[in-house]
Amino acid sequence: MLTLRKSADRGFADHGWLKSHHSFSFAGYYDPAHMGWGNLRVINEDRIAPGTGFGTHGHRDMEIISYVLQGELAHKDTLGNVVGIPPGDVQRMSAGSGVRHSEFNHAPAETTHFLQIWIEPDVTGIAPSYEQKTFAAADKRGRLQLVASPGGAEGAVTIHADARVYVGLFDGAESATLALAEGRKAYVHLVRGQIRANGQPMQAGDALLLDGECRIDLTAGRDAEVLVFDLAP
C-alpha cells in the first residue's frame, strides 16, 4: 500500500516567533487519521525567528531527533549539554525517565529551520542520554546514509527503538533503492526539491506512507533532500 500525503494537508501553527508544520497530530492540531505511522510519532517542520526559541520544557520516554536545515539550533539540557546544532548534524536525545531542555535561535537575522522527530522507544524509564553527529553532504550524495539506528550501526546515532532513519541528496540521474523486510512500514519525507518515490512524484513537504511494500525506489531527484524511515509495524 502506498499513500501520498501532500505538504498542504499537514497541520500548521503560526505562533509568530514559531511557524510549524505537523505531519502528525501534535499540540493544537488533531487528526485521528494521522496519529503516527508505526512507531514514528512526530515530524514537525519548525522555523524559529531570530532571537527566539523554546524555553526550558520536559520530555519523558521518547527518542527525539533534531535535523537542522538552515541556521543553527542552540540546545541546553539538564544533562549538562550546551551545544549548537548546525545544518547537517543529527542530534539524538533519549528522554527516558525524564529530561528538560531548551532550544533557541540566537542569530540576529537568520531563521532556524529544522525538523523535530519523535520515535516511540522500545523500553521506558531508561536513563536519559544525548548524542550528536555530523554527516557530510558527500556521504548523502546519491545514496541513503543511515543516520539513526538501534545500536548505532554504520556510524549512526543510537536510538532505543526499532527504527532506522536515512538521509539522501539526489539530483539528475542519481537514484537509490532501500529493501524493506516483510511486515515493515516505511515513511518517506521530502525536505526540499522534487523526487519520485516508488513512481510517485513528490514536492517539498510531501510524504509517502508505505505498508506491505518490499522496497523503496528513489529516482528523478531535482535538488532533493529526503528522509526515509524504516519502521516497526
Model regions and ranges:
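Jelly-roll (double-stranded beta-helix
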Residues: 1-233
